[in-house]
Regions:
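Terminal alpha-helical segments
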Residues: 1-136
Length: 136
């Protein structure tokens, strides 16, 4: 079993625990993992529309000389694309780490074709120094 597969399993269990805890406390169901849901192409399209919007803003900032300010929009452009893929395949994701694990898992399963370089942009080094620096 791959690391991505294990992580997806953990994320699915986490969401179940979170939902059960909310129900126990009488709160609105909310989770920080992954839930298997029905595929929703309309929602997937909305994520793509958000990605396109973020990309337009990033290009505007870059053209205006604000490359540093564009980084967040570029990140969320990619992330919204990942959310669209998750939605297409019938997953509701509650955090970025689970979203990334799902993308890696779907790639391993041959369901998506995505260059590994996109995964590294979202990962952090574990150097034990607590700084959470991006991998190079």
């Amino acid at each position: 079993m791959s690391q991505a597969s294990k992580h997806v399993g953990w994320c699915l269990r986490k969401a179940q625990k979170d939902i059960a805890e909310c129900e126990k406390l009488g709160k609105k169901p909310k989770h920080r993992g992954l839930m298997k849901v029905e595929s929703d192409m309309e929602e997937a399209k909305r994520h793509i529309a958000k990605a396109e919007h973020n990309l337009i803003i990033a290009e505007y900032l870059i053209n205006g000389g604000f490359t540093d300010a564009s980084v967040g929009n570029i990140f969320y452009t990619m992330y919204q694309c990942f959310l669209s893929i998750a939605t297409k395949f019938g997953y509701d994701t509650g955090n970025q780490t689970c979203t990334l694990a799902l993308m890696e898992y779907l790639k391993e399963q041959g369901k998506i074709n995505l260059d590994d370089k996109f995964f590294k942009y979202f990962k952090y080094e574990d150097e034990g120094d607590g700084k959470g620096r991006k991998k190079k």
